[in-house]
Protein backbone atom coordinates (compact mmCIF):
# COMPACT_ATOMS: atom_id res chain seq x y z
CA UNK A 1 0.00 0.00 0.00
CA UNK A 2 1.42 3.40 -0.98
CA UNK A 3 0.76 5.70 1.97
CA UNK A 4 1.53 9.40 1.55
CA UNK A 5 3.86 9.93 4.49
CA UNK A 6 7.36 11.36 4.91
CA UNK A 7 9.96 9.01 3.39
CA UNK A 8 11.96 8.10 6.50
CA UNK A 9 8.75 7.22 8.34
CA UNK A 10 7.55 5.26 5.33
CA UNK A 11 10.70 3.14 5.55
CA UNK A 12 10.26 2.44 9.26
CA UNK A 13 6.49 1.88 9.16
CA UNK A 14 6.18 0.02 5.86
CA UNK A 15 5.48 -3.32 7.61
CA UNK A 16 2.41 -1.74 9.24
CA UNK A 17 1.01 -0.60 5.90
CA UNK A 18 0.92 -4.21 4.71
CA UNK A 19 -0.97 -5.56 7.72
CA UNK A 20 -4.64 -6.45 7.59
CA UNK A 21 -5.59 -4.00 10.34
CA UNK A 22 -4.14 -1.09 8.36
CA UNK A 23 -6.01 -2.04 5.20
CA UNK A 24 -9.23 -2.23 7.22
CA UNK A 25 -8.43 1.10 8.87
CA UNK A 26 -7.78 2.73 5.49
CA UNK A 27 -11.15 1.58 4.14
CA UNK A 28 -12.89 2.84 7.28
CA UNK A 29 -11.21 6.25 7.10
CA UNK A 30 -11.96 6.66 3.39
CA UNK A 31 -15.59 5.78 4.02
CA UNK A 32 -15.83 8.25 6.89
CA UNK A 33 -14.33 11.12 4.86
CA UNK A 34 -16.79 10.41 2.04
CA UNK A 35 -19.84 10.53 4.35
CA UNK A 36 -19.07 12.87 7.24
CA UNK A 37 -17.05 15.90 8.22
CA UNK A 38 -13.80 14.44 9.54
CA UNK A 39 -10.88 16.23 11.17
CA UNK A 40 -8.14 16.96 10.38
CA UNK A 41 -8.38 17.54 6.62
CA UNK A 42 -7.24 14.39 4.83
CA UNK A 43 -3.93 15.82 3.65
CA UNK A 44 -2.96 16.58 7.27
CA UNK A 45 -3.60 13.14 8.80
CA UNK A 46 0.15 12.42 8.87
CA UNK A 47 1.24 16.02 9.51
CA UNK A 48 3.09 15.10 12.72
CA UNK A 49 5.28 12.66 10.77
CA UNK A 50 5.71 14.89 7.73
CA UNK A 51 6.99 17.83 9.80
CA UNK A 52 9.31 15.69 11.93
CA UNK A 53 11.31 13.00 10.08
CA UNK A 54 12.29 9.86 12.00
CA UNK A 55 15.95 10.77 12.47
CA UNK A 56 15.15 14.36 13.52
CA UNK A 57 12.86 13.42 16.44
CA UNK A 58 14.15 14.61 19.83
CA UNK A 59 10.96 14.77 21.89
CA UNK A 60 7.68 12.83 21.62
CA UNK A 61 4.49 14.24 23.15
CA UNK A 62 1.61 11.76 23.10
CA UNK A 63 -1.97 12.96 22.84
CA UNK A 64 -5.18 11.00 22.49
CA UNK A 65 -7.63 12.34 19.88
CA UNK A 66 -7.64 15.21 17.37
CA UNK A 67 -9.74 18.23 18.32
CA UNK A 68 -13.24 17.76 16.91
CA UNK A 69 -14.31 21.40 16.43
CA UNK A 70 -14.18 23.23 13.07
CA UNK A 71 -10.76 24.55 12.05
CA UNK A 72 -8.92 23.28 15.11
CA UNK A 73 -7.16 20.03 14.24
CA UNK A 74 -4.24 20.02 11.81
CA UNK A 75 -2.51 16.77 12.64
CA UNK A 76 -0.42 17.82 15.65
CA UNK A 77 -1.56 16.91 19.16
CA UNK A 78 -2.59 19.84 21.39
CA UNK A 79 -1.96 22.27 18.49
CA UNK A 80 -4.52 24.41 16.65
CA UNK A 81 -4.41 26.37 13.42
CA UNK A 82 -3.40 30.03 13.42
CA UNK A 83 -6.22 32.31 14.50
CA UNK A 84 -8.11 29.61 16.42
CA UNK A 85 -8.72 30.27 20.14
CA UNK A 86 -6.50 28.22 22.44
CA UNK A 87 -8.25 25.11 23.83
CA UNK A 88 -8.07 24.86 27.65
CA UNK A 89 -5.30 22.23 27.70
CA UNK A 90 -3.12 24.38 25.46
CA UNK A 91 -3.71 27.42 27.68
CA UNK A 92 -2.38 25.36 30.59
CA UNK A 93 0.60 24.10 28.58
CA UNK A 94 1.61 27.69 27.86
CA UNK A 95 1.08 28.60 31.54
CA UNK A 96 3.46 25.83 32.59
CA UNK A 97 6.05 26.92 30.01
CA UNK A 98 5.86 30.47 31.42
CA UNK A 99 6.25 29.21 35.00
CA UNK A 100 9.01 26.75 34.05
CA UNK A 101 11.25 28.68 31.69
CA UNK A 102 9.79 32.19 31.60
CA UNK A 103 8.64 32.21 27.97
CA UNK A 104 5.43 34.17 27.42
CA UNK A 105 2.51 32.50 25.67
CA UNK A 106 2.70 32.99 21.89
CA UNK A 107 0.03 34.72 19.84
CA UNK A 108 -0.84 31.47 18.06
CA UNK A 109 -1.63 27.97 19.28
CA UNK A 110 -0.01 26.50 16.17
CA UNK A 111 2.83 24.26 17.37
CA UNK A 112 4.35 23.67 13.93
CA UNK A 113 7.47 25.49 15.17
CA UNK A 114 7.92 22.75 17.81
CA UNK A 115 7.48 20.01 15.23
CA UNK A 116 10.09 21.57 12.95
CA UNK A 117 12.58 21.49 15.85
CA UNK A 118 12.10 17.76 16.42
CA UNK A 119 9.01 17.47 18.63
CA UNK A 120 6.76 14.67 17.39
CA UNK A 121 3.25 15.78 18.41
CA UNK A 122 1.52 12.45 18.08
CA UNK A 123 -2.12 11.69 18.79
CA UNK A 124 -2.91 8.02 19.45
CA UNK A 125 -5.86 8.29 17.05
CA UNK A 126 -5.23 10.38 13.94
CA UNK A 127 -8.78 11.16 12.80
CA UNK A 128 -12.14 12.03 14.38
CA UNK A 129 -15.69 12.75 13.26
CA UNK A 130 -16.77 16.38 13.77
CA UNK A 131 -18.22 17.03 17.23
CA UNK A 132 -17.87 13.36 18.24
CA UNK A 133 -14.89 12.91 20.53
CA UNK A 134 -13.36 9.46 20.34
CA UNK A 135 -15.44 8.45 17.33
CA UNK A 136 -12.45 6.89 15.53
CA UNK A 137 -10.94 5.11 18.52
CA UNK A 138 -10.39 1.35 18.41
CA UNK A 139 -10.36 1.25 14.61
CA UNK A 140 -6.64 0.57 14.21
CA UNK A 141 -4.96 3.93 14.64
CA UNK A 142 -3.74 2.98 18.11
CA UNK A 143 -1.82 -0.03 16.74
CA UNK A 144 -0.26 2.18 14.07
CA UNK A 145 0.85 4.89 16.49
CA UNK A 146 2.11 2.23 18.91
CA UNK A 147 4.32 0.98 16.08
CA UNK A 148 5.68 4.48 15.50
CA UNK A 149 6.50 4.92 19.19
CA UNK A 150 8.04 1.45 19.36
CA UNK A 151 10.25 2.14 16.32
CA UNK A 152 11.58 5.30 17.95
CA UNK A 153 12.04 3.66 21.35
CA UNK A 154 13.94 0.71 19.88
CA UNK A 155 15.96 2.30 17.08
CA UNK A 156 16.83 5.70 18.55
CA UNK A 157 18.35 6.64 21.89
CA UNK A 158 18.30 9.63 24.26
CA UNK A 159 14.83 10.76 23.25
CA UNK A 160 12.41 12.50 25.61
CA UNK A 161 8.93 10.98 25.85
CA UNK A 162 6.35 13.25 27.50
CA UNK A 163 3.32 11.38 28.81
CA UNK A 164 0.52 13.54 30.24
CA UNK A 165 -2.37 11.65 31.80
CA UNK A 166 -3.14 7.97 32.30
CA UNK A 167 -3.91 7.27 28.65
CA UNK A 168 -0.51 8.49 27.39
CA UNK A 169 1.25 6.76 30.26
CA UNK A 170 -0.30 3.41 29.35
CA UNK A 171 0.64 3.93 25.72
CA UNK A 172 4.25 4.63 26.66
CA UNK A 173 4.58 1.90 29.27
CA UNK A 174 6.97 -0.21 27.17
CA UNK A 175 9.57 2.54 26.60
CA UNK A 176 13.01 1.66 28.01
CA UNK A 177 13.70 4.16 30.79
CA UNK A 178 17.41 3.34 30.70
CA UNK A 179 17.69 4.44 27.08
CA UNK A 180 15.33 7.43 27.05
CA UNK A 181 13.96 10.07 29.41
CA UNK A 182 10.29 9.46 30.17
CA UNK A 183 8.47 12.37 31.80
CA UNK A 184 5.01 11.62 33.22
CA UNK A 185 2.45 13.80 34.98
CA UNK A 186 -1.23 14.62 35.15
CA UNK A 187 -2.88 15.87 31.94
CA UNK A 188 -3.00 19.64 31.23
CA UNK A 189 -6.80 19.52 31.03
CA UNK A 190 -8.46 21.89 33.53
CA UNK A 191 -9.90 18.75 35.15
CA UNK A 192 -6.47 17.53 36.20
CA UNK A 193 -3.87 20.28 35.69
CA UNK A 194 -3.72 21.11 39.41
CA UNK A 195 -3.14 17.45 40.27
CA UNK A 196 0.45 17.48 39.09
CA UNK A 197 0.66 19.01 35.63
CA UNK A 198 1.44 22.49 36.91
CA UNK A 199 4.93 22.50 38.31
CA UNK A 200 6.08 19.38 36.44
CA UNK A 201 8.88 21.38 34.75
CA UNK A 202 8.82 19.02 31.79
CA UNK A 203 10.01 21.68 29.35
CA UNK A 204 13.20 22.56 31.22
CA UNK A 205 13.81 18.92 32.14
CA UNK A 206 13.51 17.91 28.48
CA UNK A 207 15.99 20.58 27.45
CA UNK A 208 18.43 19.70 30.23
CA UNK A 209 18.41 16.08 29.04
CA UNK A 210 18.85 17.02 25.38
CA UNK A 211 21.73 19.33 26.23
CA UNK A 212 23.40 16.67 28.40
CA UNK A 213 23.25 14.30 25.43
CA UNK A 214 24.75 16.74 22.93
CA UNK A 215 21.50 17.88 21.32
CA UNK A 216 20.29 21.42 20.79
CA UNK A 217 17.48 22.48 23.09
CA UNK A 218 13.90 23.04 21.97
CA UNK A 219 12.77 26.67 21.81
CA UNK A 220 9.44 26.23 23.55
From Swiss-Prot:
It catalyses: Hydrolyzes single-stranded DNA or mismatched double-stranded DNA and polynucleotides, releasing free uracil. Its main location: cytoplasm. GO terms for biological process: base-excision repair, AP site formation via deaminated base removal. SMART domains: UDG, UreE_C. It comes from the Bacteria. The active site is at residue 65. InterPro entries: UDG_fam1 (IPR002043), Ura-DNA_Glyclase_AS (IPR018085), Uracil-DNA_glycosylase-like (IPR005122), Uracil-DNA_glycosylase-like_sf (IPR036895). This is Uracil-DNA glycosylase. It is an enzyme of class 3 (hydrolase). Signal peptide: none annotated. GO terms for molecular function: uracil DNA N-glycosylase activity. It comes from Bacteroides thetaiotaomicron (strain ATCC 29148 / DSM 2079 / JCM 5827 / CCUG 10774 / NCTC 10582 / VPI-5482 / E50). Excises uracil residues from the DNA which can arise as a result of misincorporation of dUMP residues by DNA polymerase or due to deamination of cytosine. The keyword Cytoplasm applies. Its EC number is 3.2.2.27. PROSITE patterns: U_DNA_GLYCOSYLASE (PS00130). The gene is ung.
Amino acid sequence: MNVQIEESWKTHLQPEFEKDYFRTLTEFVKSEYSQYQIFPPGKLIFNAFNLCPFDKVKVVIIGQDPYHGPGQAHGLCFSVNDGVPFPPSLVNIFKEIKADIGTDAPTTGNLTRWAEQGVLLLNATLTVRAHQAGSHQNRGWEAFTDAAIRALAEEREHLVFILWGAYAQRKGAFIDRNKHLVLSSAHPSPLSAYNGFFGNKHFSRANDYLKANGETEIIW
